[in-house]
């Protein structure tokens, strides 16, 4: 990572917290501690290196994940599947040095997702910054950070990975930021039914406010039976699993319609968790099961689809 590509970014508010940050804090995902985490940041560019071409001091930006920019995946606009994704986002230090963070003689891990945005200042490459243009110039910049991870994961899964079509039914499992972003995207795509399964009553209410047509309390209702009831025995055409719970994923498969498509974005609490999937069920129903990272998004998607939709009032901050 050439030093000339680096830039300094001044954050105007605290970065948002993602479950990935919490997973590292709790030891679920490996990352050397102590560390400065954070990867849903937004702010104002303060200074740029001589190699920066498209950004200047004063520009408002959203920070997203890092990628190498030159492997086969990156060249085909699939940077979330960068062949060097681990090193780019979880290496804890810049590849070219020097050490960015320290306390006394102790080195502090940083450069998390190419940014470490839980700080007043952060260093990032131009490649993983998205300039906020006039389409959202009236939106508080501190609300735009999730566009770089949570929102693009949920919305991208709907618009890119699943390519959800109008008039179809869509099931969201988990009503957090990712799931609610998927709800808004499904509404934008014109889904006839948007069903959200979420144990929190407050989140179920929020899902309805953002476009869900029905909600399910999985703690007190049978998920598969309710989906079949709502869809008149057809099952759902599309589903997005956001919880990371194996049992929920298995129920999602049982809730699918013929030729249904299920995308999985939730990381399980135990990384070695496995799900019981019947090959016969997949064959008989013609199901498609896919894993998705960052909503298959790239910088182009983040800067156009999400921001334009935000201007139209489709994407609202799930406060």
UniProtKB/Swiss-Prot annotation:
The keyword NAD applies. The keyword NAD applies. One of its GO terms (cellular component) is cytosol. It is an enzyme of class 1 (oxidoreductase). Its cofactor is Zn(2+). Zn(2+) 1 binds at residues 18, 39, 149. It comes from the Bacteria. Pfam families: ADH_N (PF08240), ADH_zinc_N (PF00107). Its EC number is 1.1.1.1. It catalyses: a primary alcohol + NAD(+) = an aldehyde + NADH + H(+); a secondary alcohol + NAD(+) = a ketone + NADH + H(+). Zn(2+) 2 binds at residues 68, 71, 74, 82. Binds 2 Zn(2+) ions per subunit. One of its GO terms (molecular function) is zinc ion binding. InterPro entries: ADH-like_C, ADH-like_N, ADH_Zn_CS, GroES-like_sf, NAD(P)-bd_dom_sf. One of its GO terms (biological process) is formaldehyde catabolic process. Keywords: Metal-binding, NAD, Oxidoreductase, Zinc. Belongs to the zinc-containing alcohol dehydrogenase family. PANTHER family: ALCOHOL DEHYDROGENASE (PTHR43880), ALCOHOL DEHYDROGENASE CLASS-3 (PTHR43880:SF12). This is Probable alcohol dehydrogenase. It comes from Pseudomonas sp.
């Amino acid at each position: 990572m050439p030093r000339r590509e680096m830039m300094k970014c001044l954050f105007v508010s605290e970065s948002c917290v993602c479950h990935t940050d919490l997973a590292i804090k709790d030891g679920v995902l490996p990352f050397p501690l102590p560390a400065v985490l954070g990867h849903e940041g937004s702010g104002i560019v303060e200074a740029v290196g001589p190699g920066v071409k498209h950004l200047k001091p004063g520009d408002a930006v959203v920070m997203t994940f890092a990628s190498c920019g030159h492997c086969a995946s990156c060249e085909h606009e699939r940077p979330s599947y960068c062949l060097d994704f681990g090193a780019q986002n979880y290496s804890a230090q810049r590849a070219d040095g020097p050490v960015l963070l320290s306390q006394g003689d102790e080195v502090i891990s940083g450069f998390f997702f190419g940014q470490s945005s839980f700080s007043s200042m952060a260093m990032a490459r131009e490649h993983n910054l998205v300039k906020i243009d006039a389409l959202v110039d009236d939106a508080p910049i501190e609300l735009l950070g999730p566009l770089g991870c949570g929102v693009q994961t949920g919305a991208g899964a709907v618009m890119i990975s699943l390519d959800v079509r109008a008039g179809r039914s869509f099931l969201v499992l988990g009503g957090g930021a990712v799931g609610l972003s998927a709800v808004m995207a499904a509404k934008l795509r014109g889904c006839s039914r948007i069903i959200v399964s979420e144990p929190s009553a407050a989140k179920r209410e929020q899902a309805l406010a953002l476009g869900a047509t029905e909600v399910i309390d999985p703690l007190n209702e049978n998920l598969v039976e309710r989906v079949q009831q709502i869809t008149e025995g057809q099952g759902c055409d599309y589903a997005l699993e956001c919880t990371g719970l194996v049992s929920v994923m298995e129920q999602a498969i049982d809730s699918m319609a013929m030729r249904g498509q299920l995308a999985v974005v939730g990381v399980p609490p135990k990384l070695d968790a496995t799900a019981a999937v019947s090959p016969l069920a997949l064959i008989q129903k013609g199901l498609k099961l896919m894993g998705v990272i960052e909503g298959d998004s790239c910088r182009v998607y983040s800067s156009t689809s999400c921001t334009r939709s935000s201007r139209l009032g489709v994407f609202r901050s799930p406060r």
